[in-house]
Amino acid sequence: MKRLLPFLTDLEAWVEQLIPLKQMTLDSRQVTEGDLFIALKGHQCDGRQFIQNAIEQGAAIILAEAESDQDEIELDSQFARYNLDRRACKVITVPRLAERLSAIADSFYASPSAKLKLIGITGTNGKTTTAQLLAQWHNLLGGHSAVMGTIGNGLYGQEQEAINTTGSAIEVQQNLARFVEQGADFCAMEVSSHGLAQYRVEALQYDLAIFTNLSRDHLDYHHSIAAYEAAKFRLFNALQTKAQVLNADDQVAQNWLSMLPNAVLVSCDPNFTSEHQFVKATKVNFSLQGAYIEFESSWGNGQFHSQLSGAFNVTNILLALAGLLTLGYDLAKLVATASQLRSVTGRMQKVSAITDKNRPLVLVDYAHTPDALQKALQAARLHTKGKLFCVFGCGGDRDCGKRPLMATIAEELADGVIVTNDNPRTEDQHKIVAEIMQGFAKPDNILVIYDREQAIQHAIKHASSADLILIAGKGHENYQIIGTIKHHFSDQEIASKYLSQ
């Protein structure tokens, strides 16, 4: 057993020989006879504590994270008490196992990312919409798309709920292998900063990486904007990425240009010029039906109607357009199908009354960062004839620094604000709201209704048919997390219920 893997560089090749094993997993509860169990030291718990469980459930081989980089890849003495010979299970410790896991899973699942076009989208906001637009567009042109991200993982239109935007290194490779098996030839994948910082996508072969924007988020994890930006940039400079598309209207993208000389740039500034290949909007007209967009590009010019609302969605659709053009798609075919692209669930989604009563317009959006809330309210204002109301809260156990910032934005851009619960999780709802309230210049004008359904009901009851209500923060989510329990809750369902009364 000692020095079973004498050279660290042989690890992936060795894993390829394990293909006859049924599966590899990080969860000891999912282990069955003959499986490969990965025991990682995680951020919340140490998977090595469950090695005994995995052995008892029939694991054939266990890779366990070594205590230090200097540890040899060998049977560690701390596991000797498990009587491994009797159980015919090999336990091997591996230095930097978390960093290597993506490559190990890539070998185990026969490099699925090389068998389809893989596009990675990263940024604070816009990842989901851009990914969904890419998948839709590819399908409209006769392809077979899959998506991975916040809404879920699966073939486009058949997504299954995902716990994280970017799953574990094993889950990502498992999903890609399944997509290939199901006939997908294209995958649009949201890539989170957590996923990048934790090496979950390290071995993926990206045909294209897209950067949407960067603003404050996840500082509870990254601690600084600089660290957050560095995690995002890994998709462009540290991984196997063949081409890049950047939102040139974001300052962070400008900072990256010297390091990405071949990047394709997207801008909504008609005066934008660049030596890079580009796509830019030259004219945009907004209406309740969406937006009319004229553009120029290195591939030619065109115009089309988009069903999506908001200036930020003009950026998202142009990022998708630039991405597909970069991959060699035909401009004329893209323009001809652009008007068929549908809005994304929970992204500036219109909610209508079941009856034809005169009721306010309600938009549900996932905006849960200061930048996203600002852009959503600015977009909503374009469609508001009367007053603009905003219903929002902030998630518990997450970056608390953004709470007063979102309050300031809501107060500045909306005519009326109701503060309510988002997903309080294990944090006290009163503490969350108190921190939000610190951002209001005139807190006496702000209504606080902790119960989210009652907050939505109040907004609809007191709004006129000329008014618009933006319900922000949860978007596509059909649950509310209170404590550690997920309760069924849908902003769309609740809004539709009270609009129809």
UniProtKB/Swiss-Prot annotation:
Main localization (coarse): cytoplasm
InterPro entries, per the entry: Mur-like_cat_sf, Mur_ligase_C, Mur_ligase_C_dom_sf, Mur_ligase_cen, Mur_ligase_N, MurE/MurF_N, UDP-N-AcMur-Glu-dNH2Pim_ligase
Processing and modification events after translation: Carboxylation is probably crucial for Mg(2+) binding and, consequently, for the gamma-phosphate positioning of ATP.
Residues at which meso-2,6-diaminopimelate binds: R398, D422, N423, P424, R425, G473, E477
Residues found modified as N6-carboxylysine: K232
Cofactor names: Mg(2+)
Broad class of enzyme this protein falls into: ligase
Keywords for this protein: ATP-binding, Cell cycle, Cell division, Cell shape, Cell wall biogenesis/degradation, Cytoplasm, Ligase, Magnesium, Nucleotide-binding, Peptidoglycan synthesis
Cell location: Cytoplasm
Family: Belongs to the MurCDEF family. MurE subfamily.
Function of the protein: Catalyzes the addition of meso-diaminopimelic acid to the nucleotide precursor UDP-N-acetylmuramoyl-L-alanyl-D-glutamate (UMAG) in the biosynthesis of bacterial cell-wall peptidoglycan.
NCBIfam families cross-referenced by the UniProt entry: murE, PRK00139.1-1, PRK00139.1-2, PRK00139.1-4
Protein name per UniProt: UDP-N-acetylmuramoyl-L-alanyl-D-glutamate--2,6-diaminopimelate ligase
Species this chain originates from: Haemophilus ducreyi (strain 35000HP / ATCC 700724)
